[in-house]
Amino acid sequence: MNEYNFSDIEKSTQEYWRKNDTFKTIEDNTKEKFYCLSMLPYPSGTLHMGHVRNYTIGDVIARYQKMQGKNVLHPMGWDAFGLPAENAAIKHKKSPYEWTKSNIAYMRSQFDSLGFSFDWSREIATCDEDYYKWEQWFFIQLYKKGLAYRKNSVVNWDPVDQTVLANEQVVDGRGWRSGALVEKKEIPQWFLKITDYADELLQDINKLDNWPEAVKTMQINWIGKSKGLTVKFKVKDSNQEIEVFTTRPDTLMGVNYLGIAPEHPLALKEAKSNSQLAEFIEECKKTSTMEADLATQEKKGFKTSIKVIHPISAETIDVWVANFVLMGYGSGAVMSVPAHDQRDWEFAQKYNIPLKQVIESNDNKLKIDLEKQAFTEKGILINSGEFDSLNFKNAYQAIKKYLTEQNKGYETTNFRIHDWGISRQRYWGCPIPMIHCDDCGAVPEKEENLPVRLPTDVALTEAGSPLKDIPEFINVACPECGKPAKRETDTFDTFFESSWYYARYTCPTANQMLDQEANYWLPVDKYIGGIEHAIMHLLYARFFHKLMRDQGLVKSDEPFKNLLTQGMVLKDGAKMSKSKGNIVDPQELIDKYGADTVRLFSMFAAPPEQSLEWSETGVEGTNKFLRKVFNYAELNKVIFAKNITLESQKLTKEDKKARFEIHSNLKQAIFDFDKSQFNTVVSACMKILNTLNNYDNLSESVKVEGFSILLRILAPFTPHLCHYLWQQLNLGEDILHTSFPTVDNNALEKDEFLLVVQINGKLKAKLELDASLSSNQVEEVVLADEHVKSFIDNKQVVKVIYVPQKLINIVIK
């Protein structure tokens, strides 16, 4: 008997796929389409187990849908721009382009070795001119609509990487890659007006029925819509006003101070004549601006000489510069009510600022101790003059009316989200297609001149982008007046590329951004990726889709119908990482066990949404199962050569039992496939093989039927072995183009059933009975059974309770 030689099987199968162009998408608009997409990887150079799991999930779904007869699109590409490639290129003394393309070639070969069914004819790399040309074109359309703009902005500046960092990239005040202390710096930045779409992005979350609730909640919180009042505080002895937004106007009478951001114009103005304040502002520049960090870091402040007038009481209120107030949110100022806000309370305790209680609890029994903490619940107003005794709802309306009539405030809908800063001061990215002219200002490049090509012959250093030092790149004629001008040297944030790649896969060679194929394929039917992308990538992609819709490029409102967020791969309870020394190399596993084993383990060890704990024993177990599958085929290959057909009238009792188990497991597998519960689909495969092995006298026709069902369920998981056995057993040419098995409902109808017999609720017997018996007949048979009679003779049968074809309980006394 031949042994399972996974290496030969996988090589020959992959060669078959290559020769026959098996995975090329066939345009067939008569079929139902299914667009399956896994998030494109950054070409780091090698695959890790997280990649294997993520892309195996997508491949299983794509193969299953293809066997369901659908027209499947399953593409792959590369998120190729970005700082990591630039830094790696500097380190290895190569160009980023050369480094990236080399990594892509190797990773593509690794993908192929795992048997992924990607249509490589649609491959894109975001660093290719044919790709980024169209995002430059799109940016120009957005600029013409006023949706892209440039303004000075205070940013997180990494002095080592010489680029702007998002708030999320500042960790403990340091750059997430360089480790350098981050500085606050005001520089001109390009932005997209995502705030114009904030309401729609929020409302359309209701359309995302097949997205995880956790992701939807994160997006809702990130967009952060809130209704409140903007209150005007007049600066004493000045015509200026400080506006603050609050969702709790009921606490307005308890304002003890205003907090302003270190970058607030009033703070900067006073710092010119106050060296201590200037030092404090410099210190604030070195702290994190991430909200999570702001919540936990020490609250620090500096009392200014600025005073404001309370809009209702006319009291004089101090203004403090506070390290927890961000200039990028709202007006860069907050009203502080220490008695009713915990952060304000902590600040007041530190600087001995008095508290003024203006809310008491609805619960008279609740004792409020402001010496221990702030009272933050809504309640009844006290110490608030004419607003005393009002509850929150009535106080909100009364204070709104007063402020509006006095022109001291107005109702506002506020959003936590702010416009997306898309400028990066690095080389390895898509050039922003704008030109700066002294006379005309910022002018878009002429569309016929696109793409604005990224120069490849450059000398890279760690000190920022070399583009500003390349005369032939930077020195151009103004597209409007023809005078000498300067090209923009910033490049796009790499999230710009990854926000529309899914659409370009539908028409990767089109001589326009998107063509009519986009509306056939979009939206994506199944999108697979990590939950860590919940906010940035997934929100930006939703934003881009709406921008493309409004440009007439797509018709749908949302890019992704169904989102699956896979869990991490853990080892020893921790995420695999080089620093922890717990990395498992997928290539070593493929060499030792074969790609099919690696794929099957990654699907069987845990449901896709949960973290998977790495287990060498588990890998060995899945390999053992595949050897059993191979051995069953070897032992029974003579039977398959006979071209046997199933004849139901010739089935034995054992055949019928086996078919019931096989088709029950098939039914469960189909249900679990549709729910993406792949671990239980694999369990169903194992049960079917057990059924085939456990019955000694199965008819050959049942063996053929059962094993062909097993191979087709297993094929999306272990495509090499199933393809090989399908051909070896003369079941067909290519299992991928075979229809997925359907359940024979006749097989689920039992001739017999096992009845549990209880007497006074205690198990006494199990009887196998004819399924055609009526309730009365079942009762007669049971009461006549010799074993049962031994318990009820000389006893009075009070009643008989029968649960059809499951249980009968005889009550006696």
From Swiss-Prot:
GO MF annotation list: aminoacyl-tRNA deacylase activity; ATP binding; leucine-tRNA ligase activity
One GO BP annotation of this record: leucyl-tRNA aminoacylation
Coarse class of the protein's main subcellular location: cytoplasm
PROSITE patterns from the UniProt entry: AA_TRNA_LIGASE_I
Domain of life: Bacteria
Residues given in the record as ATP binding sites: K578
Signal peptide: none
The protein's Enzyme Commission number: 6.1.1.4
Keywords on record: Aminoacyl-tRNA synthetase, ATP-binding, Cytoplasm, Ligase, Nucleotide-binding, Protein biosynthesis
Keyword Protein biosynthesis attributed: yes
Substrates-to-products reaction catalysed: tRNA(Leu) + L-leucine + ATP = L-leucyl-tRNA(Leu) + AMP + diphosphate
Gene3D superfamilies (alphabetical): 3.10.20.590, HUPs (3.40.50.620), Isoleucyl-tRNA Synthetase, Domain 1 (1.10.730.10)
Residues spanned by motif 'HIGH' region: 41-51
Locus of motif 'KMSKS' region: 575-579
Gene Ontology CC: cytosol
Compartment list: Cytoplasm
Entry-linked InterPro entries: aa-tRNA-synth_I_CS, aa-tRNA-synth_Ia, Leu-tRNA-ligase, Leu_tRNA-synth_edit, M/V/L/I-tRNA-synth_anticd-bd, Methionyl/Leucyl_tRNA_Synth, Rossmann-like_a/b/a_fold, tRNAsynth_Ia_anticodon-bd
Family listed: Belongs to the class-I aminoacyl-tRNA synthetase family.
HAMAP family linked: Leu_tRNA_synth_B (MF_00049_B)
Protein name as catalogued: Leucine--tRNA ligase
